């Protein structure tokens, strides 16, 4: 008899149960770079599937890097698919805001925090929906007030 078992919850198994298997193989050997590449592939797939043409890989990578470490492919797929699928079809950049919210638990409204997270003024405009000129002015005023 050959029994093959797979799980994402290996660490929750009792050691006595694990000893009953002749072999235990760990396939979770993804580097963070591998996981970023996988997340980009999922993004491309879902943008095509949901007919969203606007893509900014640099911004996508910055948002994804807020997750440390990046989750494994199954979780990446769900995260990206949900952000794209439930985004506003009339706003091709809405999935960035949804992705940011899902990852941070916060709406991308605090422009100072976005700047601290190394987003550019253009990227802050996309995430916050505040015009670039207003973002630049507010950031300048914050610096002058310090």
Model-found features: residue ranges?
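Short alpha-helical "recognition helix" segments of helix-turn-helix
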Residues: 123-126
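DNA major-groove recognition helix of helix-turn-helix
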Residues: 80, 128, 139-140
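Short, solvent-exposed alpha-helical "recognition" segments
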Residues: 135-146
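Conserved H-loop
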Residues: 8-9
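Short coil turns linking two alpha-helices in DNA-binding domains
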Residues: 72, 131-136
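Short, amphipathic alpha-helical "recognition" segments used to contact nucleic acids or chromatin
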Residues: 101-119
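Conserved AAA+ ATPase core "coupling" helix
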Residues: 1-2, 14-49, 78-79
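Conserved AAA+ ATPase small/helical "lid" subdomain
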Residues: 49-103
């Amino acid at each position: 008899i050959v029994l093959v078992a797979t799980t994402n919850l290996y660490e929750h198994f009792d050691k006595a149960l694990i000893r009953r298997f002749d072999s235990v193989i760990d396939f979770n050997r993804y580097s963070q770079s591998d996981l970023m590449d996988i997340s980009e592939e999922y993004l491309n797939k879902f943008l095509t599937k949901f007919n969203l043409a606007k893509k900014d890989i640099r911004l996508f990578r910055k948002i994804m890097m807020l997750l440390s470490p990046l989750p494994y492919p199954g979780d990446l797929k769900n995260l990206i698919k949900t952000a794209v699928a439930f985004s506003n079809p009339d706003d091709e950049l809405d999935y960035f805001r949804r992705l940011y919210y899902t990852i941070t638990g916060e709406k991308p409204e605090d422009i100072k925090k976005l700047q601290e997270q190394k987003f550019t003024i253009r990227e802050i405009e996309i995430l916050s929906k505040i015009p670039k000129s207003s973002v630049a002015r507010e950031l300048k005023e914050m610096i002058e007030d310090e």
